[in-house]
Structures are given as C-alpha cells and as structure tokens.
Amino acid sequence: KEDNTQVEVLPVNETVEEVAVVEKYFDRSRSAISLLGTFNVRDKDGNDITGAFTPRLKSLLILLVLYTEKSKQGILTKKATDILWSDKEEESARNNRNVTLRKLRILLEKVGDVEVVSDAGFLCIRWHEGVFCDYRMALDCIRQFKENGDHGDDKLLNQILEILLYGPLLSNTIVDWLDEFKDSYSSLSIDLLRNLLDVQRNNYDTVLRIADILFLHDPLNEEALAAKCSILFIQGKKGIAKSVYDRFCKEYKDSLGEEYKVPLCNLYK
C-alpha cells in the first residue's frame, strides 16, 4: 500500500477530461501478478519479467490463478492437462506439463512468496504475504463491498474503483477457455458499477469516476453516458458533454453498424 496521495488521470471514452486527486491503495510495481488489463508479472525488485513467460507458461499461470479463485482446491491436474496439452498423447502431455510446472515454479520464486501446490490430484496457487494479484484483490474487494451493503465505507469504495480502473480481465489474451472467466468478471464489474451510479448519484465527482470506469468495461454503456452527460451539463460543461456524446455515437455506429437514436437533450432529463 502506498500512503501518499497521487494524481490519478481518468480515461473518458479515449480522451482524458477529468483529473481526480485520490489516494492510491495498491502497488503493482513489484512482487505482482497482474491479470486486469494486460498480463504482467513483476519480480521482487520491480523488474518486468513478463517476457520470461512463454505462451504455455503464461496460460498455465493464468489457468491456476483463475481456477484457484473459483475453488480453493484449484483445478484437476487432468483437466489442466486436457486444456493446455490437448494436442499431445497422454505420456507426452504429462511430460510437457511437468516440465512447464517446474519452469513456472522457478519463475514464481522470483516474484515472491507464491507457489504452485499439487495435492490430491489438484493444482492450485498458494498465496503468501507480500505478493499482489489484482484479480484476486478485485474479487475480494467486491465480495466485501456486497457483504457490507451498497453503502460500504468510502475507503472500500475507492479501493474498488481503483482496481476496476485497471480494466477488464486479460483484454489482450484470446483463448476459448478464458471466455467464461472474462464474461463472469465483466458481468460482476458492470453490475456493480451500474449499481454504484445509482447509489452515488448525488456525489457528482464519484459518479463521473464511476462512469469513466464503466466505459472501460462496457464502451457502449448508455447508463454511463447518461450519468456523465447529465452531470457535465449541470456543471455547465456543455461542450465537454457534447464531445463525450459524439464519441459515444461514433463508437456505437462503428460497433453496431447503426446510429445511436437517443438525442443528447434526452440525457439531460
């Protein structure tokens, strides 16, 4: 955790328009495995060792992290083998798996106190103090927030917004078996952010933050558009509201092949 307050620049539909001064709670600069946004791994000294992960090593690490968060047992060794080495005969697949596991364990030693555990036919990741994983932290923060109710404390709210600002789960990694995890995380994030738009509706600065982050997870989210344009209009920033709306309309047409039919004036109501 960083105790100092820093300036955070929030992306708004690909253009930076608002700058908020917020406290930073998380540090992905060392001893970190990052799955939100793009895949990244940092060692104990802060060196970026992402390049040391071959596609197979990367896939194995991601698989173990995701399945361990889904269930403490992790994933059946056979299932992991079937997913990652489906093109190999049984013996060859087993040998390849064991070699990859050894290499992964060596790399994780550089990251910090985190290990791959094989137990009772399952593989899982065991986390210890000092190693940060953004995906794991995001799920934990969201879980805490739901347990505390929609009006959770401001610190937890800001932690959630900070970590959701990292972006969707593994946005640049495209493999079939990831889809269910991506969809689940996306749905969880979007539902929470939409709810927060309503809960925080009288806190304009927070709503603007939430809308910006919601656009990261769902670029065509109409609730984020309406909330942002409405507040900018109230604040007298009609030109910025028009720019946000115009970019949304362009992205809407580029993505769906049709015009966005809700006029800007309707968003101010």
Per-range role (PLM):
Residues K1-R56, S118-F122:
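Short boundary/linker motifs that mark transitions into or out of structured domains
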Residues D48-L84, L104:
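Short amphipathic alpha-helical recognition elements used for nucleic-acid or partner binding
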Residues R94, D150-L157, Y204-D205, K238:
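TPR-repeat structural position
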Residues G112-H151, S186-S189, L264-K269:
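A short linear beta-strand->loop->alpha-helix hinge motif most characteristic
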